[in-house]
Regions:
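Short beta->alpha linker loops
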Residues: 53-56, 77-80, 108, 165
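Catalytic core of DAGKc-family lipid kinases
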Residues: 43, 91, 95-218
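ATP/NTP phosphate-donor binding region
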Residues: 1-76, 87
């Protein structure tokens, strides 16, 4: 089936709602959209286009697309933008959610969930061709339920992972450094340097699979997908969450752990303790929490993380 036939077979109700979330930098953003628009137009894709002005506008625009009846909504963005869109979709009633198909064209600083499926930011043509084929798979979401310091209750969904502790701190420092330096690469390097002078352990109370642990922990990753390499065996359609709990290793072993993380062998490290579960609870008053790369409000008291199986219709590669 060629691309034009794929679009024609959808019918009028399959017109895409395209939510474009640009990276920082007006010139680069304009060039990126021009390339993508050319790819879409060459394939005869019918779509309506909206662009987010900031991270806060993604959910507002997603709500607008849903209210206007779009059944195929494609997010052009990274992990955080996709997370915002999914959380907006999950606020709809089940009857609405089940009629909406969500697609992704990677365009973020971090595109870990896109990489899991094989979507490549450098190959829009391949990604668009896959989306045109409209192959749908129901995927799981993780959900973290917590209360913030002002007493507000939050239920926040995630596609990729929740990080607690050191990894969340690195992400927070990277975001802060990127605002100051403007370069994502410089921000990443500077955040790693800053971590040398940062605390590496947090008192945590974890309960996973009825195993109760109360001790100092460096970082915890709860993955619905690969979790930036920390939960490499997780898949977002298994009905389970993968959990990696990392105790504080000596300095030399910390460097070894980074090497294993970058080479895809993170679970081989002696300080990494893996679990697989449907839910867990955690309590830590000091550790930051990151949800799909974005910082959560600091939780207070115990919070619960669970799996919600097969709740999103996601467009996957052929």
């Amino acid at each position: 089936m060629n691309s034009e036939q794929g679009v024609m077979n959808y019918g009028q109700d399959m017109r895409w709602g395209l939510l474009y979330c640009p990276k920082k930098g007006i010139h680069e953003s304009s060039r990126r959209w021009s390339r993508l628009k050319r790819t879409l137009d060459e394939r005869g894709v019918r779509y309506d286009f909206v662009q987010s002005e900031s991270a806060d506008s993604v959910e507002r625009l997603m709500t607008m697309l849903l209210r206007n009846g779009y059944k195929t909504i494609v997010i052009v963005g990274g992990d955080s933008a996709l997370n915002d869109a999914v959380n907006c979709l999950m606020r709809e009633v089940r009857e609405v959610r089940e009629t909406v198909h969500l697609g992704l064209i990677p365009n973020g600083v971090v595109n870990d969930f896109a990489r899991y499926w094989g979507f490549d930011e450098r190959n829009d043509a391949q990604t668009v061709d896959w989306l045109i084929c409209h192959r749908v798979r129901k995927i799981d979401l993780g959900c973290i339920s917590y209360d913030s310091k002002n007493g507000t209750h939050h239920d926040r969904y995630f596609l990729n992972c929740v990080n607690i502790g050191l990894t969340a701190d690195i992400m927070h420092l990277r975001r802060q450094a990127r605002k100051l330096l403007g370069s994502s690469h410089l921000a990443f390097l500077s955040s790693l340097v800053l971590m040398l002078f940062h605390r590496h352990d947090y008192k945590m109370h974890l309960n996973v699979n009825y195993e109760d642990t109360c001790r100092s922990v460096m970082t915890v990753c709860i993955g619905n997908a690969r979790g930036y390499g920390q939960t490499p065996s997780a898949v977002p359609y298994s009905g389970m969450l993968d959990v990696s709990v990392v105790y504080n290793p000596p300095g030399r072993q910390l460097l070894e752990g980074l090497w294993l993380l970058f080479t895809g062998r993170f679970l081989n490290h002696s300080s990494v303790h893996p679990y697989r579960t449907r839910e867990l609870t955690c309590e830590s008053s000091k550790a930051r929490v990151g949800i799909d790369g974005r910082m959560a409000e600091q939780p207070t008291g115990q919070y619960r993380i669970r799996i919600e199986p097969e709740v999103i219709n996601f467009l996957i590669p052929e």
